[in-house]
């Protein structure tokens, strides 16, 4: 189906594995295929038998066949939903190089550790042009790197200008494949409009832009209600955009191998 751009599914057993993987190898050349497999443990397999009366394959054998066919396997149900949410409005990332706009140094450290230890993502050095643009909105004593700690710029420029300039600079950097911004939203820090995020995402349509929030739940809900209908996915936990990007980067790599 040419109108189907990605396939995400849950599976407990395979009755015709040869046919399944033959089709999978053909499909994964053109579009991402993401699998959540149930019954991978003895307890899970027993539960699968009890409600489907079917037997699953040996999980290690299945895992190897899945990788060889170009399917990307995940292990959390929430990731299936979040990956679908990210794929629907945004392109796949071209690679694993992420530009991150962080609202604090603590978030930057925590998420750098997460990406290094649990994903294939990297935060590459920024180009001199990108650094110069971001420095122009920051107090002079601030050291700029990737991840970008944007809070000092927010204190002098306000939320909208600081995030707009930082996100735009990262999207224009040829060494960046995707941009994640985490925003701390309160009544004092909420921008007048989120149009700038929608506009930047549309202008740089070939790079995904993901937004996550930390702060007042009512302010977060307003931002989500504005951004998502306009094609910018948002994520409830600050770790989620990076976990999703890891999945989608693996999808891109699998498509290239296929």
Protein language model regions, located:
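Catalytic-core regions of core metabolic enzymes
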Residues: 1-258
